[in-house]
């Protein structure tokens, strides 16, 4: 057996997103304040920091103001403050603008900024490195390391140079062990190691199941005459019907570009729904098509998001580490924001870890982190909106949204609801194919609407082809023998990258094909597969999308 080299750190962080980078920065800040020399490294599976980051994004700067008060001096996010905030309710041909006074003040986007979250993370990485943080892009954390007492003591990166059949190629290199006094998992939504941590330590015992949405995003260069920097629009209603929930966004950002996208909540019941196709159909609405006329699509991507809110947040700590950011699920769905809460979670965990290490502790539970969360503005913010998502799911888009609005207003005025509604797993919601009708989707015209393969091309996705398939099946027979007759194999449609296909059905010999090289790491298959037969694991580090400005 090949021996792996090891490197010791005080803290190891898995994932260079906003939570992981904020944790690293705050950890070094606290160490400097106490006159201590503490070490921290950040592992990032993307080819560079930001390569796998995708968001709208409209960002509340509250955590940035706390972490780096002078951020406006040189951060690219500061270029475009939000100047206008609109909410459209769509029918197939028309829109209704929701009156501003109908929504609570915390939904108004006052003082926020719109821009690329990937570029914000690149900027944060630079600030982290200035403080002495070591960042390793292109290294995927593939294994959790446990000590003899079962406590987490770090992670190991994946082996490189392994062929599809599992044999070692000529360029084989074993993974590297990174040992830590505390390990933070900041993998984002549905992290594969986070799943193992939650299962191993039963962290979800007292929380609801996490629930999810799939965001499909495009970046467009539009007609300069139509561009209004700082204009932010959210939509609800069409094209989704009674069997699905979600909504769209249009953000006028820097350089004449518009970020647009559509989130489909993954509790939908019709197995013929395609979140990718819903987004393409949404663009054909007259108001949206007019904005994009004469423009050009320049980038594409997709990513699942955690929608469960407060009641789905698991226990945040375990012996030897913590969950931060969207690994835990701090997204505020009604505000359509999670960057500020993710950053704050990382900062709170970092402060707890620094204090513990300076007190000569290691590998125990950082109880100060959940205590800080309980006393923080993050928990208060999430508590106010905790019933919004379940109300919309239970009562539908319009009645549910109305009831949700009432609860938010009451909570805003301090009238706390005496109940918290429950969530149910997204993979349990599909109906049999014979009980539903397939939606009608537009044929791609290559100008306004597109197919999945040409879209994946714009994500700059690349994987080493001669490596083990990272989309694993617990039982290879299930897709054809169960999912196909029951649901017409929904993986063909819920995947936004064309990874899954059924071929040979026309000659009576159906076969399930996995085009793993197309995978944009959205994690939807791991979430929505009705039998939970698909398990997403990391491919070689550096593989996946390379989002330049998303």
Placement of each model-derived feature along the sequence:
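Active-site-proximal substrate-binding core of FAD-dependent oxidoreductases
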Residues: 329-335, 347, 351-396, 513-515, ...
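N-terminal FAD cofactor-binding segment of flavoenzymes
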Residues: 45-94
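Beta1/beta-strand and adjacent pyrophosphate-binding region of the FAD-binding site
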Residues: 4-19, 41
